[in-house]
């Protein structure tokens, strides 16, 4: 009875709109509003937007950003970055007949102690041989590991969403086999400084050849 009465009392509370701000690395830009009858219920809520909406640049609509509310002050909810992902339609549009798509999964630790999973994809001009696929995948890994260890989370995410990291991979890997494009298709924050990440199996990197 007490629990039922508590739920009834919570439902009776007046709901309030809270302004949601992007993380500091994205300039605390407003990303929308969310409704709650208790500010504590906002903590942990995940907010999705696109880089296009955040920057008013329509060409960036294929980049989805995920933020998590981690603090509330007054009628404002603050967020932290937890990952990004390119839209499925966009990635599919890059796969052409008789070409290769070379995926990799790279777990890296930034200079400020964040464990980040980075998933690059390289798209070749024509179908690559197995040894070329292996070499390009290894170059992707080494570029990401080398860069991530020398910059903080903010710097890494900026290089991902602005395309600098994918450009660095492209410059090094094109010497192995001509590439049409390189994208960092997804990132995930696995753990913050001092946190223990949840156990997760790392999928095998794959190559997909257009038929």
Swiss-Prot record:
Matching InterPro entries, A to Z?
Ribosomal_eS1 (IPR001593), Ribosomal_eS1_arc (IPR030838), Ribosomal_eS1_CS (IPR018281)
Q: Which PROSITE patterns match?
A: RIBOSOMAL_S3AE
For this chain, the family text in UniProt reads:
Belongs to the eukaryotic ribosomal protein eS1 family.
Organism of origin is Methanothrix thermoacetophila (strain DSM 6194 / JCM 14653 / NBRC 101360 / PT)
- What lineage is this protein's organism placed in? Archaea, Methanobacteriati, Methanobacteriota, Stenosarchaea group, Methanomicrobia
Look up the coiled coil feature and give its residue ranges.
none
**The protein, known as:** Small ribosomal subunit protein eS1
In the record, biological process GO terms are:
translation
Q: Which gene is annotated as encoding this protein in its UniProt record?
A: rps3ae
Example GO molecular function term?
structural constituent of ribosome
> Which NCBIfam families does the record associate with it?
PRK04057.1
Q: What are its GO cellular component terms? A: ribonucleoprotein complex; ribosome
Q: Tell me the keywords, alphabetical order.
A: Ribonucleoprotein, Ribosomal protein
Top-level taxon in the UniProt lineage: Archaea
């Amino acid at each position: 009875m007490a629990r039922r009465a508590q739920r009834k009392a919570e439902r009776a509370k007046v709901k309030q709109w809270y302004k949601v701000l992007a993380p500091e690395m994205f300039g605390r830009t407003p990303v929308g509003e969310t409704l709650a009858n208790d500010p504590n219920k906002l903590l942990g809520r995940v907010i999705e937007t696109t880089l296009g909406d955040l920057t008013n640049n329509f060409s960036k609509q294929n980049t989805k950003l995920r933020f998590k509310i981690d603090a509330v002050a007054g009628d404002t909810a603050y967020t932290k970055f937890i990952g990004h992902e390119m839209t499925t339609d966009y990635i599919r549009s890059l796969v052409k007949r008789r070409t290769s798509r070379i995926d990799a999964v790279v777990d890296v630790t930034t200079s400020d102690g964040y464990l980040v999973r980075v998933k690059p994809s390289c798209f070749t001009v024509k179908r690559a041989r197995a040894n070329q696929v292996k070499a390009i995948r290894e170059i992707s890994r080494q570029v990401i590991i080398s860069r991530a260890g020398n910059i903080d989370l903010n710097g890494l995410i900026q290089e991902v969403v602005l395309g600098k990291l994918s450009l660095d991979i492209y410059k090094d890997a094109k010497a192995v086999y001509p590439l049409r494009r390189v994208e960092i298709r997804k990132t995930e924050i696995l753990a913050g400084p001092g946190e223990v990440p949840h156990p997760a199996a790392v999928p095998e990197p794959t190559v997909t050849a257009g038929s």
